[in-house]
From Swiss-Prot:
It comes from the Bacteria. Belongs to the ATPase gamma chain family. F-type ATPases have 2 components, CF(1) - the catalytic core - and CF(0) - the membrane proton channel. CF(1) has five subunits: alpha(3), beta(3), gamma(1), delta(1), epsilon(1). CF(0) has three main subunits: a, b and c. This is ATP synthase gamma chain. It is found in: Cell inner membrane. Produces ATP from ADP in the presence of a proton gradient across the membrane. The gamma chain is believed to be important in regulating ATPase activity and the flow of protons through the CF(0) complex. One of its GO terms (molecular function) is ATP binding. SUPFAM superfamilies: ATP synthase (F1-ATPase), gamma subunit. Its main location: membrane. Pfam families: ATP-synt (PF00231). One of its GO terms (cellular component) is proton-transporting ATP synthase complex.
Amino acid sequence: MANLKEIRNRITSVSSTMQITSAMKMVSAAKLKKAQDAITAMRPYAEKLTELLQNLSATLDGDAGGEFTKQREIKKVLVVAITSNRGLCGAFNTNVIKEVKNRADFYAGKQVDVFAIGKKGNDVLSKTLSVIDNQSSVFDALTFDNVAKIAQMLTDKFVAGEYDRIEVIYNQFKNAATQIVQTEQFLPLAPIKSDLPVSTGDYIFEPSKEEIVLTLIPKSLKTQLYKGIRDSFASEHGARMTAMHKATDNATELRDQLKLTYNKARQAAITNEILEIVGGAEALKG
């Protein structure tokens, strides 16, 4: 059994760790609220934009999307991996990294590059895959305009023929305890299918519907990427809050066990001292 000093040191160490994890949990909870409000606020806009694009595209020829919908033989693939800049968030980053590697295996025999958004994904994936860029600084100022610049970079690479397919992998936010890894095709735009009835109202379009669609598609792509990053940002704080909550509970349990061990050891030491005193007294009498 460890001596009393060692046990006291361990209790102090665990208590300090517990204070840190508890503080991190509270910070993540506050950040989660803001991130959750942001993703909730933008979803109606994203859904309405998609609905409008669906209604317009359903009444046009299949090639109305121009370069954005052009299907090419898949030889070069770019996978956008959205992770976080910090750790201590459970399997949040690991799940995305695992899915990126699965996609690389799926496209075996083809050129597969990674476009990292987040330091954690970049640090791991750059060891085994070709990472062409890392835009982790976007989290320092997470605005639509900053994300739009990244979306434009990706779009330019596709239109220029550098890649035949671009996919985005991220954690979709459900709630604080649940994040679901999503793989979405970014470009080319997948054929638009909807079970909803197409609005066929008598509208006058200015300019033409074709021009409106070609204007909406870039906006839709920027919104899609912004939504993915916002989802990931909220998921990160939810995952970290959950992880720190579990860590705090585990630290509390370990501290209580150490206190029990300490009390038992202290009681045993006192008992031994009493026995030694009694034994010494008996020896003097004898």
